[in-house]
Amino acid sequence: MNTNVDMNKLQDNAVKIFTSGFACSESVISAIRDALELDIPDSAIAMSSGFPWGMGGAGCLCGAVAGGAMCIGFLYGRSTPGDPKINRCFELTKEFHDKFKKEFGATC
């Protein structure tokens, strides 16, 4: 995993991926996978395909927020019930949510 990530390059890549035809959630996951050199399978990107435009067009949640939360879960999430790793995952996801909302004014 690459831990020396240029956030401007990551953002530029996400925009490039978005303009090539992926939606926000797909673009965010793909760009994070590239920047951090993670072994995220294409199926994870496919799993995010229902998030765009606020959960399938319902306008409820920004796909970029959902995609970012999925990547945090990939790195810090749990795979068994009761695993205390969930606490750090929640903490980081809330921090991401709050920063996104502060910068963009909403998560919807």
Model-predicted regions and their roles:
Residues 1-108:
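Structured, active/binding-site neighborhoods that engage oxygen-rich ligands
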